[in-house]
Every structure is written in C-alpha cells, then in structure tokens.
Amino acid sequence: KEVVTPQRDSLVNRPEKHPESYYGAGAAQIQLSRGDKLHEAGFRGQGMTIAVIDAGYHNADRITAFDMNRVLGVKDFVNPRADIFAEQSHGMAVWSCMGLNRPEVMVGTAPEASYWLLRSEDDYSENLVEQDYWSAAVEFADSVGVDVINTSLGYYTFDDPSKNYEFRQLDGRYALMSRQASHVADKGMVLVCSAGNAGAGPWKKITPPADADNVLTVGAVGKDGVLDTFLSIGNTA
C-alpha cells in the first residue's frame, strides 16, 4: 500500500478559485472521465448512497466545500474511539473527488450523493488485521443499504515480511479482502477499487482487492490520458 498525501489544510485555509471552470481544480479529471456529461444529463449522485472505505478524513468536517449534511454517518473500524477527522487525510482526498461541491474551487463527480465515511486503514502499521477491518466495513456498508463502495486501498507487503504476497496469489481468492470483495456484487452493491500505486516499484502488479471477481478496478492516467508510471499493472474493469 502506498498513499499519496495532499497538502492537508489547503482546502480549509487557502481554497483557490479557478474562475475559468465551474469544476475548479477538478475540471481536467471530470472531463477526462466524462463526468461533466453525466451532470449535464442530470446525474449528480442524487438518490445514491456511497461508502468510502479508506484511511482518515483529516479536516473534512472543516472544509466548507463538503456538505456534511450529505454524510449519513462515520465509523472507525481500527479504533472505534478515534476521531476520523483527526486521522490521515487520504480518505478525505478520495472523498473530495466525488463529494466536493463548491463551484470554481472544486466540484466532484457525485456532489448530490449521500455518504458513509468508514476507516479501515491503520496508517501506523501494515498488518493482515487491516483486511479484517476492511471486511467488517464492507459488511457494515451492506447493513446500512449502501449502493456503491469506493476504496483506494491495497496490500501486498506487511511489517512481518513472511506475510508478504507473491504474484501467484493474485487470484482473487487468496487475500481475505479479495474474497470479501468478490461477494459484494452478490449483495447488490458495486465495489470500485484502485488498481494500486506499485507500478514503479519492484512489485509492479495490482494489489488486493483489485484482483477480486465482480469489482471495478480502476487505473490512473494523467491529464493527457497517458497511463501514470506509478500505476499497478494488471487487469482493470
């Protein structure tokens, strides 16, 4: 797992405007994925419930571009007593791509959806138990009627090297979270997960749960539509 941490407080303290575009800082990405065309057709996430399963959501409750009224609830599966808004910011960055809604600053792909913000990633260690946390978060999402799960997590190395995965284990059945992910569609939900950020390192391959059956594994491209060098290699949607 590798997480790219943005400048944590930039949207809180310095919300930069981009008057040349309604979508602000998100203009290039939403146009590349044709999300703007969906918006023009009236599809802005309304009536959908999305669960984000990730690391923390640092300062998301202070960023006014987020509509906290659209947050149905939060739950921390790593430390139930922790404040997910005081933890790592990767989940906040992921959510922002969908949920931000401030014209000329940034408008995400689903600004009118409802959200559950769930934390399963322990930023201070890398252990197999985090896949148990993730699996519990998936079951919780099912219990509260979620339509779509978005998760940008993946695992292949651990603090105990004897637990590290091997290429032959990328079969959608070996890793616990891959087995769990394969059942999500059976419950009527869509799971969208990142391919991984290991493309430039020695591993290179996609990371579980991206190898699961019946999920949408999404890669990464730059503004020019060319695959990014960090993108993990393997099957996507």
Feature names for model-found ranges:
Residues K1-Q29, D36-H39, D213:
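Autoinhibitory propeptides
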Residues D36-K75, P80-E130, V144-D147, D160, ...:
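Subtilisin-like serine protease catalytic core
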Residues D54, A181, G196:
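Active-site glycine-centered loops adjacent to acidic/histidine catalytic or metal-binding residues
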Residues Y115, E139-D171, S194-A195:
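Short acidic, glycine-rich surface-loop motifs adjacent to enzyme active sites
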Residues Q131-W134, F158-D159, N164-E166, S178, ...:
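Active-site-adjacent substrate-recognition loops and nearby beta-strands
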Residues G172-G188:
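Catalytic-core regions built around general acid/base machinery
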